[in-house]
Amino acid sequence: MNKETQKIVDQYERRKNNENVIRHSDNFYFNHFAQSERELVYTEIIKKRFNSPGLIKILEIGAGTGVNLHFFKRLGFKWENINANELLSDRFEVLRNTFPQIRLFEGDACDIEINQENTFDIVFQSTVFTSILDTTFKIKLANKMWSLLKPGGIVLWYDFAFDNPKNKDVKGIKKKEITQLFNQSKRIVFHSTTLAPPIGRQVKKLYPLLNLFPFLRTHLIAEIEK
């Protein structure tokens, strides 16, 4: 494990004992509305770009415990076409036990071998890049994702655009930086999403109403075309 990946592992170890993280993880209304919102956008993107979900081959970078993998299966993806990478060993064990039918890559995603079998229609990341504070490593990972992508495929991106003043282990990534990371892309389409978490956690059932105002959204979904 290199220095940068070790930093990420250490960050997540600290989060396990962070009272704010523990408290927010159980916020039903915010988690429900935020997840439903982004899954709707993913669905619209995928149905617009691909004719048959059953033929799409996808790789998720930093899949965690597999919440998104369940979503892609519900959308019509076949298990044999769903692939996942995870750096953290405890989360990887959950993936291995929960998804014995999919192909898994443990450790640093930059170490995934590039070959004909390891090329994908979609390479997906969700809140991975904001945990990487080193610019060089972000560029390296973006280049690896690009190299794993088939021509005509997309990098599907979900992450927050603004810094979290209460968490120095993360750094927001705006449109300009995404464009620089994937400067080989012929076209990037952005969608603003996710009501600002400090607001969303407080307003509960009013999330959909306040989320009508784009200036209150803090995250970006990006379709990054190859």
Predicted regions: what they are:
Residues M1-S25:
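N-terminal, positively charged/glycine-rich alpha-helical extensions of SAM-dependent methyltransferases
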Residues Q35-G54, F71:
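Conserved alpha-helix/loop element of class I SAM-dependent methyltransferases that forms part
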Residues L59, T65-I112:
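Class I SAM-dependent methyltransferase SAM/SAH-binding core
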Residues I114-V123:
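A short acidic, Gly/Pro-enriched loop at the edge of an enzyme's catalytic core
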Residues I122-T136:
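A short SAM/SAH-binding and catalytic strip from SAM-dependent methyltransferases
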Residues I139-P151:
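A short glycine-rich, Lys/Arg-flanked "PGG" loop and its adjoining helix->strand segment in the class I
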Residues G152-D159:
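Conserved beta-strand signature within the Rossmann-like core of class I S-adenosyl-L-methionine
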Residues V170-T193:
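Short alpha-helix
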